[in-house]
């Protein structure tokens, strides 16, 4: 059995998908689920699901399937969501506040302890019960609330400064939405999400589809 840290990143990224499906199955009181059923729910092949889970041990019985509650609890522990994860969002603009609202409503495994901004129009407000602090209070709140994950939704020019301040408070996981190349110590993991690049990549595929349709129309 491979240890948690040895699983490929592609496997790790599929685990939350499995967890979401398992959450829904538990809510529907489905006690046993097969890899074939998980395949239908996730879009991944049954073989891929079995291989992914095998990285972390044996969870089911051949011909019987997986105990849904047990598998869900194991996946929670593997990801690290069996304990509350505190999150700070830096940048309380449209993206930051939307991210906070979504997590409060849809993500029971994390707690957004605060949004941070410099605008007097929003500092002191509450977003879905999440307080908006001034950026000057970032390190104090991060330290007090034992924040483990930072979400960066500030303009690119300010993103590196935010990284440096979060790293100084021993935050080891950062989700960055700013279109900037950021640097951090080797033991800090940064996941970059550039929505503009994602949209442009999608347009490329949409263009191919449109070109194909245009060609067919000319035939």
Swiss-Prot record:
Any single GO BP term: response to redox state
GO CC field: cytoplasm
Keyword Hydrolase: no
Source domain of life: Bacteria
GO MF, one example: DNA-binding transcription factor activity
InterPro entries per the UniProt record, alphabetical: CoA-bd, NAD(P)-bd_dom_sf, Rex_DNA-bd_C_dom, Tscrpt_rep_Rex, WH-like_DNA-bd_sf, WH_DNA-bd_sf
Gene3D superfamilies in the cross-refs: NAD(P)-binding Rossmann-like Domain (3.40.50.720), Winged helix-like DNA-binding domain superfamily/Winged helix DNA-binding domain (1.10.10.10)
The keyword Nucleus belongs to this UniProt entry's keyword annotation: no
Alphabetical UniProt keywords: Cytoplasm, DNA-binding, NAD, Repressor, Transcription, Transcription regulation
Pfam families reported for this sequence: CoA_binding, Put_DNA-bind_N
SMART domains, sorted: CoA_binding (SM00881)
DNA-binding region: 17-56
HAMAP family for the chain: Rex
Matches recorded under PANTHER family: REDOX-SENSING TRANSCRIPTIONAL REPRESSOR REX (PTHR35786), REDOX-SENSING TRANSCRIPTIONAL REPRESSOR REX 1 (PTHR35786:SF1)
Subunit field text: Homodimer.
Function: Modulates transcription in response to changes in cellular NADH/NAD(+) redox state.
UniProt name for this protein: Redox-sensing transcriptional repressor Rex
Lineage: Bacteria, Bacillati, Bacillota, Clostridia, Natranaerobiales
């Amino acid at each position: 059995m491979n240890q948690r840290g040895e699983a490929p990143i592609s496997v790790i990224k599929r685990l939350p998908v499995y967890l979401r499906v398992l959450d829904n199955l538990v809510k529907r009181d489905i006690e046993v689920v097969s890899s074939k059923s998980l395949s239908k729910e996730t879009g991944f092949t049954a073989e891929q699901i079995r291989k992914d889970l095998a990285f972390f041990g044996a969870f089911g019985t051949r011909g019987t399937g997986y105990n849904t509650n047990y598998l869900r609890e194991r996946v929670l522990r593997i990801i690290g969501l069996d304990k509350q994860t505190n999150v700070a969002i830096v940048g309380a603009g449209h993206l930051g506040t939307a991210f906070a609202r979504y997590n409060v409503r849809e993500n029971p495994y994390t707690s957004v302890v605060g949004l941070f901004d410099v605008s007097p129009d929003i500092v002191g407000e509450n977003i879905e019960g999440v307080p908006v602090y001034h950026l000057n209070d970032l390190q104090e709140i991060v330290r007090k609330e034992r924040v483990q994950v930072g979400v960066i939704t500030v303009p690119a020019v300010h993103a590196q400064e935010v990284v440096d301040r979060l790293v100084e408070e021993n935050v080891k996981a950062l989700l960055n939405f700013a279109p900037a190349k950021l640097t951090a110590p080797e033991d800090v993991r940064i996941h970059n999400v550039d929505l503009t690049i994602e949209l442009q990549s999608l347009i490329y595929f949409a263009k191919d589809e449109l070109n194909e349709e245009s060609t067919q129309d000319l035939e």
